[in-house]
Amino acid sequence: MDENKKRALSVALSQIEKQFGKGSVMRMGDRVIEAVEAIPTGSLMLDLALGIGGLPKGRVVEIYGPESSGKTTLTLQAIAQCQKRGGTAAFIDAEHALDPIYAGKLGVNVDDLLLSQPDTGEQALEIADMLVRSGSIDIMVIDSVAALTPRAEIEGEMGDQLPGLQARLMSQALRKLTGNIKRSNTLVIFINQLRMKIGIMMPGQSPETTTGGNALKFYASVRLDIRRIGAIKKGDEIIGNQTKIKVVKNKLAPPFKQVVTEILYGEGISREGELIEMGVEAKLVEKAGAWYSYGGERIGQGKDNARGYLRENPHFAAKLEADLREKFEPTELSREEGDEDTLEDAM
């Protein structure tokens, strides 16, 4: 850069600092680039697929999927993991459907969980913004975008046509929220539902879409698609679901990774089941017929018995998890990838 341009830049930077404060503009090399903090999800497979060891703090995350696919279960397990590490959690229950007994079974400390059941979408997002700006919340879940009903819709008549009202509400709220989320280093998770598109579609185009417009798609750093793909049986009794989770978008590591895990009724994501599956894949756990062995010791005949053995011997499970992390965890846990999406497109 020639001297005239350097002087002009120096004058501009000094004027910006006077008007907006020191640090308003800085060179990237002037600050240490820190690894993004992450909150574990409760699923070792998903933490590894996300590439940073969990869901990123200071970012917006969207989790969507069909009904009863495990969306709320996944977020409650993330809350439990955050609380175990001394964090503070908030749950904005726009659906008015949170079951505290089930949350407790998943490890959530319901006595310390901040809960809001707002009447309107505006109230829910205003409460979320105030909690984020307080700087004291580590993780916040909004369940769900589809239930964030605009005030005009609630006060209107049944059958009133109010096109685009919820999409405008979400776009405005996210413009306001994202800066505060980054400054307060809060993880904000939006749970979303699926709807079917109406009209003519191009061949190969998915008929499914999420509610609340396009704003959330652009502002989210991570988007997870979670779906039930099968049942887990113990004899004739169904004890859980086999669930596929796909990382549809990831600004912090390579996207499009997917995992298949087990969600057991009343227990959530089966940590022991994941350890067995990953152990077999990594050849750390030997499978001979129906028997599973680890470190030369038989741990059970059939997956259900092996799962029970690991649950009864937590030190054994912890050793297997440590071996798996050593084998699977990437050496570079955080890499911010460029995203060419412009926020103007979200409007």
UniProtKB/Swiss-Prot annotation:
> Which residue stretches does the UniProt record annotate as biased composition, category Basic and acidic residues?
327-336
Provide a GO CC annotation, any one.
Answer: cytosol
Gene Ontology MF terms in the entry: ATP binding; ATP hydrolysis activity; ATP-dependent DNA damage sensor activity; damaged DNA binding; single-stranded DNA binding
The record's Gene Ontology biological-process terms are:
DNA recombination; DNA repair; SOS response
Protein name (database record)? Protein RecA
Main location group: cytoplasm
What residue spans carry the region label Disordered? 327-347
Tell me, what does this protein do in biology? Can catalyze the hydrolysis of ATP in the presence of single-stranded DNA, the ATP-dependent uptake of single-stranded DNA by duplex DNA, and the ATP-dependent hybridization of homologous single-stranded DNAs. It interacts with LexA causing its activation and leading to its autocatalytic cleavage.
